[in-house]
From Swiss-Prot:
GO terms for cellular component: host cell plasma membrane; membrane; viral envelope; virion membrane. It comes from the Viruses. The keyword Transmembrane applies. The gene is HN. This is Hemagglutinin-neuraminidase. InterPro entries: Hemagglutn-neuramid, Hemagglutn/HN, Sialidase_sf. It is an enzyme of class 3 (hydrolase). GO terms for biological process: symbiont entry into host cell; virion attachment to host cell. GO terms for molecular function: exo-alpha-sialidase activity; host cell surface receptor binding. Residues 1-26 are intravirion. It comes from Newcastle disease virus (strain Chicken/Northern Ireland/Ulster/67) (NDV).
Length: 616
């Protein structure tokens, strides 16, 4: 029994001894494995120079720096991408569109002539040099960022004078009208043989031409056809427009003074004429007794017309018959436009009363002087389907000379500041169903005209006046959304007298540096301006056709003043200012006088100012 127990105990001791050594072995193996792993990790870390926990703190910073470098690189490439996109998606299609537009205009012109061949309307439509394709009647400067007045006119450039001048001391050329389409330009002025005040008889010069580029790259206007209408008809206040059939012209036939015409009981005779591409001129009297049955006096606006939707649109103004339907429709209507940062101090009720009275000046016997627009269908038949639009006087001021312009897809009506408001006005115009609608105008506070007191250049309150002078602005600078930003023009920089013509670029409140025609005592009158681009060189030019006096031959000489539009890249911030203020450091660009300087003697200047203020 004892022996058996001993045997069992011995076996148990042996089993326990085996288990103990097995455990020791396992622990030793485990420790060895851990030590091996630790040594391996240390060796690996040492060989790869791995970061310690303190080193890992800088990883986010390093990532941020790398991100900035990548972003910067992408940003620099974005400029290239943007330029490529602009060229491919914007500029190239626009250039193609401009080319297509010019081709279509030429085709349209030819189709008009082909359709009218049986009526001897002529053939062989002219067209400007290819350098001008896409540069006429377009938005020439599209810039959202630059200050408008950082664009400014160069000194006047010598070019071919396409306008005939008087040849005797008593001769007079006055009232220029100009319009240019994508294919040709049209120009007209009045010629009086015995002084500018004669209303009994005159000639009318009418010309058709194209823009050319000389071998040396200079711009010049080439007259292809011209005619001097020297007959028994006394055409006055003519407006001209370039249409697909040639040069359409609207004139009044006058045999009495303007005051006598307003006191008459019947409308003024009017004629629609055309100088065709074959050099032949034809005209037709309009039925004014029906078209202007509510009018006692009616005149074209002098400024150019515009070809829109197969019709030619002319500015018109004149006097309404008292108590006629057109006169009654305007009763009590008025509008007051205000100067920039220069409020009229008069009581509001008094301003309203004076604004209403401004439409019926005493000079014309208290007749309502009304603005209007006449559209005529362009066909081989003259005077076809005329339609008269009379805009409400809640938009327009007292009727006055004007101009209809088309730039890009936008249409405008310029209205001369014959009433109390001195700054230049451009009314946006939309057309539909043969009629026009005018909208609240763009105003250019530094683009003023001289006028008699109380409607001088600095006037700020409504008053009854018939004053001012025709000096139209041309839309030049646009936002990318086609909103007008700035205009070019030649103004008479004097408060009361028609003196000191200067050219400049204008925004709504200020003007650029100026280019002066001559001395401040130089007498001048009407100016009309048109801008275009030589696409080949990407240079923008503006033409101001101006009536300038102080010459040996004739009381007035009509001169085409040509400038290039330059840019002062150092000017970035727009500044408001009165018309007499210029930017610090700027100097007027005064070219060598192209006419004789007047002696600036006190008595001479007094006589000159009185003489200059006497013109209509």
């Amino acid at each position: 029994m004892d022996r058996a127990v001993s045997q069992v105990a011995l076996e148990n001791d042996e089993r326990e001894a085996k288990n103990t050594w097995r455990l020791v072995f396992r622990i030793a193996i485990l420790l060895l494995t851990v030590v091996t792993l630790a040594i391996s990790a240390a060796a690996l870390a040492y060989s790869m120079e791995a970061s310690t926990p303190s080193d890992l703190i800088g990883i986010p910073t390093a990532i941020s720096r790398a991100e900035e470098k990548i972003t910067s690189a992408l940003g620099s490439n974005q400029d290239v991408v943007d330029r490529i996109y602009k060229q491919v998606a914007l500029e190239s299609p626009l250039a193609l569109l401009n080319t297509e537009s010019t081709i279509m205009n030429a085709i349209t012109s030819l189709s008009y002539q082909i359709n009218g061949a049986a009526n001897s309307s002529g053939c062989g439509a002219p067209i400007h040099d290819p350098d001008y394709i896409g540069g006429i009647g377009k938005e020439l400067i599209v810039d959202d960022a630059s200050d408008v007045t950082s664009f400014y006119p160069s000194a006047f450039q010598e070019h071919l004078n396409f306008i005939p001048a008087p040849t005797t001391g008593s001769g007079c050329t006055r009232i220029p009208s100009f319009d240019m389409s994508a294919t040709h330009y049209c120009y007209t002025h009045n010629v009086i043989l015995s002084g500018c005040r004669d209303h009994s008889h005159s000639h009318q010069y009418l010309a058709l031409g194209v823009l050319r580029t000389s071998a040396t790259g200079r711009v010049f206007f080439s007259t292809l056809h011209s005619i001097n209408l020297d007959d028994t008809q006394n055409r006055k206040s003519c407006s001209v427009s370039a249409t697909p059939l040639g040069c359409d012209m609207l004139c009044s036939k006058v045999t009495e003074t303007e005051e006598e015409d307003y006191n008459s009981a019947v409308p003024t005779s009017m004629v629609h004429g055309r100088l065709g591409f074959d050099g032949q001129y034809h005209e037709k009297d309009l039925d004014v007794t029906t078209l202007f049955e509510d009018w006692v006096a009616n005149y074209p606006g002098v400024g150019g017309g515009s070809f829109i939707d197969n019709r030619v649109w002319f500015p018109v103004y004149g006097g309404l018959k008292p108590n006629s339907p057109s006169d009654t429709a305007q009763e009590g209507k008025y509008v007051i436009y205000k100067r920039y940062n220069d409020t009229c101090p008069d009581e509001q009720d008094y301003q309203i009363r004076m604004a209403k009275s401004s439409y019926k000046p005493g000079r014309f016997g208290g007749k309502r002087v009304q603005q209007a627009i006449l559209s005529i269908k362009v066909s081989t038949s003259l005077g076809e389907d005329p339609v008269l639009t009379v805009p409400p006087n809640t938009v327009t001021l007292m009727g006055a000379e004007g101009r209809v312009l088309t730039v890009g897809t936008s249409h405008f009506l310029y209205q001369r500041g014959s009433s109390y408001f001195s700054p230049a006005l451009l009314y946006p115009m939309t057309v539909s169903n043969k009629t026009a609608t005018l909208h609240s105008p763009y105003t250019f506070d530094a683009f003023t005209r001289p006028g008699s007191v109380p409607c001088q250049a600095s006037a700020r309150c409504p008053n009854s006046c018939v004053t001012g002078v025709y000096t139209d602005p041309y839309p030049l600078v646009f936002y990318r959304n086609h909103t007008l930003r700035g205009v070019f023009g030649t103004m008479l920089d004097d408060k009361q007298a028609r003196l000191n013509p200067v050219s400049a670029v204008f925004d709504s409140i200020s003007r650029s540096r100026i280019t002066r025609v001559s001395s401040s005592s130089t007498k001048a009158a009407y100016t009309t301006s048109t801008c275009f681009k030589v696409v080949k060189t990407n240079k923008t030019y503006c033409l101001s056709i101006a009536e300038i006096s102080n010459t040996l031959f004739g009381e007035f000489r009509i001169v085409p003043l040509l400038v290039e539009i330059l840019k002062d890249d150092g000017v970035r911030e727009a500044r408001a200012g009165r018309l007499s203020q210029l930017r610090e450091g700027w100097k007027d660009d005064i070219v060598s006088p192209i006419f004789c300087d007047a002696k600036n003697q006190t008595e001479y200047r007094r006589e000159l100012e009185s003489y200059a203020a006497s013109w209509p």
